[in-house]
Amino acid sequence: MKKVLVKAVHGYQRWISPALPPACRYYPTCSNYMVQAIEKHGPAKGLAMGTARILRCHPFCQPGYDLVPDHFSLRRNWAEPEKEEDSN
């Protein structure tokens, strides 16, 4: 089931998404988030997390990073990604 869902998202990314204007306000994009959530949390929880992410991606949301959390949650992950230290 996991592979079927991931293939469906990849099909969307390859065939449908290029025909639409870019609209995702988050990083990673909603479709990439869906794939990562499915791979990390399994098909049922990953699909629920991806759907929740799509529903909160709208013009009135605050854009930014929203990485897939380590623990199942339908809420936004407000944690900023770790920044690499500059060696200079």
From Swiss-Prot:
Cross-referenced PANTHER family: MEMBRANE PROTEIN INSERTION EFFICIENCY FACTOR-RELATED
Keyword Transmembrane helix in record: no
Name of the protein: Putative membrane protein insertion efficiency factor
One GO cellular component term noted in the UniProt record for this chain: plasma membrane
Keyword Nucleotide-binding: no
Family statement drawn from the similarity comment of this UniProt entry: Belongs to the UPF0161 family.
Main location: membrane
Membrane topology: Peripheral membrane protein
Function in brief: Could be involved in insertion of integral membrane proteins into the membrane.
Any coiled-coil regions, as ranges: none
Compartments where located: Cell membrane
Record's keyword terms, sorted: Cell membrane, Membrane
Superkingdom of origin: Bacteria
NCBIfam families assigned: membrane protein insertion efficiency factor YidD
Pfam families, alphabetized: YidD
